[in-house]
């Protein structure tokens, strides 16, 4: 098979990678990868870095040694500067107001093109009496489904699917329902004789519960100490393992001792936090393009400078995210 080489973008090693760039990231003024790299560095770094640093960053990005997160690439040179890929949200109070607020925060974040993760553990279980308004609580799972449907309708730029993560503590009274909440093959569609899972095999876009959402169970210090004491992981964990082996979900979120409150995750779960409205700030170093340890160190240093500039330049969806970014300033 002849080796692929593009005249416009010679740094790409396959037509597939160039097609992704053209479909997702190329836009006016950034029609080629090197043009995007130059525009992006000038847009993000402005006067915060020296000309030499910016020139070297442009070369590193052009050569695919350092690749900023996808939102950096998408918003390079655009009027809005939503450079952050994801946001970490927390249901903070078991109240009607917080229930509504988490929807507003989720939609505000998703409309920038960033993904979200939400810990719903504070919400009361299904069926508990509501003293203030009367009736019975619906529990956290319907709220997860509401956020899932917001994500279904928020297609940033008309082409980007929302990325969503949801978690629940292992002691929550609704955890058994949560564990089975994506068992689509156990969910019949009326009298058709088919399950949601069977139909979704044929039509990827067929609507299914939490189909836009990755889910995980949170395990805390109490769970760990009980395991150390008794050697028993407990029914919830065993069911979680069976589910994960069967369908890959739910996953596992382990938060112990001084990190016990860091239950928040972004949609891809590489960032952890205990602070509501936290934000991730992503870039990747492509070691396959780097020749030696010295070059690796140089790339890391300039990539760090670039991402720090991003924390000064990036626009955010609402005020609390600015405050949390100022506190944590994550890279």
Residue ranges and their predicted role:
Residues 1-331:
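Extended catalytic cores of very large enzyme megasubunits
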């Amino acid at each position: 098979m002849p080796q692929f080489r593009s005249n416009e973008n010679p740094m790409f090693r396959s037509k597939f990678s160039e097609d992704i760039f053209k479909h997702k990231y190329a836009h006016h003024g950034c029609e080629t990868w090197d043009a995007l790299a130059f525009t992006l560095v000038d847009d993000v770094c402005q006067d915060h870095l020296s000309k030499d640093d910016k020139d070297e960053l442009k070369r590193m990005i052009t050569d695919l040694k350092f690749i900023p997160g996808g939102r950096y690439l998408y918003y390079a040179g655009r009027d809005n500067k939503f450079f952050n890929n994801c946001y970490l949200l927390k249901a903070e109070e078991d109240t009607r107001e917080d229930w509504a607020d988490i929807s507003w925060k989720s939609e505000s974040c998703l409309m920038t093109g960033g993904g979200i993760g939400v810990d719903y553990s504070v919400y009361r279980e299904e069926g508990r009496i509501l003293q203030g308004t009367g009736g019975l609580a619906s529990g956290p799972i319907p709220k997860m489904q509401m956020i899932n449907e917001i994500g279904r309708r928020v297609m940033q730029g008309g082409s980007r699917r929302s990325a969503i993560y949801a978690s629940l503590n292992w002691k929550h009274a609704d955890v058994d329902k949560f564990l089975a909440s994506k068992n689509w093959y156990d969910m019949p569609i009326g009298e058709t004789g088919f399950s949601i899972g069977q139909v979704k095999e044929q039509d990827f876009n067929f609507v299914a519960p939490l189909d836009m959402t990755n889910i995980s169970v949170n395990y805390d210090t109490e769970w760990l100490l009980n395991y150390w004491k008794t050697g028993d992981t407990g029914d919830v964990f065993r069911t979680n393992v069976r589910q994960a082996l069967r369908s890959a979900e739910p996953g596992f979120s382990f938060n112990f001792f001084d990190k016990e409150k860091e239950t928040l995750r972004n949609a891809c779960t590489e960032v952890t936090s205990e602070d509501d409205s936290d934000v991730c700030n992503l870039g990747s170093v492509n070691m396959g393009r780097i020749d030696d340890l010295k070059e690796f160190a140089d790339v890391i240093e300039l990539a760090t400078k670039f991402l720090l500039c991003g924390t000064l330049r990036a626009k955010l969806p609402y005020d609390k995210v600015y405050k949390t970014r100022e506190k944590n300033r994550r890279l």
